[in-house]
């Protein structure tokens, strides 16, 4: 199944959450922090703000840092993804 975001929305997949701390403590789901680094899977065509077209800055394959509580979580074919708006992207990670 392919998801194609609309407007200024972006489909991302978060980096896996840490299951065990560096000291070996296993973390239950209730105390794990939501990761903020994600990979861009798909990008919408852009949106309209104040009557003007907004170009998308991020592109498919980018690694990004996103706001901690941004987006809508979805599950597709057993995989977890999040749909966010471009404004929720704080930075693009460049290697």
Swiss-Prot record:
Domain of life, per lineage: Bacteria
Keyword Thylakoid (UniProt): no
InterPro entries named in the record: Chaperonin_GroES (IPR020818), Chaperonin_GroES_sf (IPR037124), Chaprnonin_Cpn10_CS (IPR018369), GroES-like_sf (IPR011032)
GO cellular component, one term: cytoplasm
Family annotation (SUPFAM superfamilies): GroES-like (SSF50129)
A family per Pfam: Cpn10
GO molecular-function terms, A-Z: ATP binding; metal ion binding; protein folding chaperone; protein-folding chaperone binding; unfolded protein binding
Annotated family: Belongs to the GroES chaperonin family.
Quaternary organization: Heptamer of 7 subunits arranged in a ring. Interacts with the chaperonin GroEL.
Free-text function comment from the UniProt entry: Together with the chaperonin GroEL, plays an essential role in assisting protein folding. The GroEL-GroES system forms a nano-cage that allows encapsulation of the non-native substrate proteins and provides a physical environment optimized to promote and accelerate protein folding. GroES binds to the apical surface of the GroEL ring, thereby capping the opening of the GroEL channel.
Name under which the protein is recorded: Co-chaperonin GroES
Source organism per UniProt: Caldicellulosiruptor saccharolyticus (strain ATCC 43494 / DSM 8903 / Tp8T 6331)
């Amino acid at each position: 199944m392919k998801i194609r975001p609309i407007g200024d929305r972006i489909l991302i997949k978060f980096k896996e959450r840490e299951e065990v701390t560096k000291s070996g403590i296993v973390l239950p789901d209730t105390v794990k922090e939501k990761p903020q680094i994600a990979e861009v899977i798909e990008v919408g065509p852009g949106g309209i703000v104040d009557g003007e077209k907004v170009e998308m800055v991020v592109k498919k394959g980018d690694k990004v840092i996103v706001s901690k509580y941004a987006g809508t979580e979805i599950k597709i074919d057993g995989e977890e993804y999040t749909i966010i708006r471009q404004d929720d992207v704080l930075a693009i990670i460049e290697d």
